[in-house]
């Protein structure tokens, strides 16, 4: 416990929290340009071909981003919107692509969890009685 005089001389320092997505620089989203689209295999107990893209952000940082959902329209030189969020079984992938923004189409035929995959609402046709 510090003395009163010590607190007058040296104020208490608050702990600095380490961010999990440093490339976003405290922003919720950043835009970028896709450099490479590739597939990556996950860590040990899992097996798949996860879709990943390397993106150069607007702040000149290059990051690996995960492309969620089934099928995607991400190509080289596409403009993408990037959000934070790690993929547990892919080391070094700390970001996600936002589907349905800029040049990226949403997942087609998606009925549940549409907002996460940029899928439009199905149009209901009114019938006469």
Swiss-Prot record:
Keywords: Methylation, Ribonucleoprotein, Ribosomal protein, RNA-binding, rRNA-binding, tRNA-binding. It comes from the Bacteria. Residues 110-129 are annotated as: Disordered. GO terms for cellular component: small ribosomal subunit. Transmembrane segments: none annotated. One of its GO terms (biological process) is translation. InterPro entries: NA-bd_OB-fold (IPR012340), Ribosomal_uS12 (IPR006032), Ribosomal_uS12_bac (IPR005679). One of its GO terms (molecular function) is tRNA binding. The modification 3-methylthioaspartic acid is found at residue 89. NCBIfam families: rpsL_bact. Part of the 30S ribosomal subunit. Contacts proteins S8 and S17. May interact with IF1 in the 30S initiation complex. With S4 and S5 plays an important role in translational accuracy. Interacts with and stabilizes bases of the 16S rRNA that are involved in tRNA selection in the A site and with the mRNA backbone. Located at the interface of the 30S and 50S subunits, it traverses the body of the 30S subunit contacting proteins on the other side and probably holding the rRNA structure together. The combined cluster of proteins S8, S12 and S17 appears to hold together the shoulder and platform of the 30S subunit. Belongs to the universal ribosomal protein uS12 family. This is Small ribosomal subunit protein uS12.
């Amino acid at each position: 416990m510090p003395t009163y005089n010590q607190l007058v001389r040296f104020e208490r320092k608050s702990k600095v929290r380490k961010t999990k997505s440093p490339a976003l620089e405290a922003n919720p989203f950043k835009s970028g340009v896709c450099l490479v689209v590739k597939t990556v295999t996950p860590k040990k107990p899992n097996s798949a071909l996860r879709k990943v893209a390397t993106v150069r952000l607007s702040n000149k940082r290059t990051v690996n981003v995960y492309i969620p959902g089934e099928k995607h329209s991400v190509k080289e030189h596409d403009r993408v919107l990037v959000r934070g969020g790690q993929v547990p079984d892919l080391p070094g992938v700390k970001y996600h692509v936002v589907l349905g923004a800029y040049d990226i189409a949403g997942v087609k035929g998606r009925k549940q969890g549409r907002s996460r995959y940029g899928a439009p609402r199905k149009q209901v046709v009114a019938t006469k009685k």
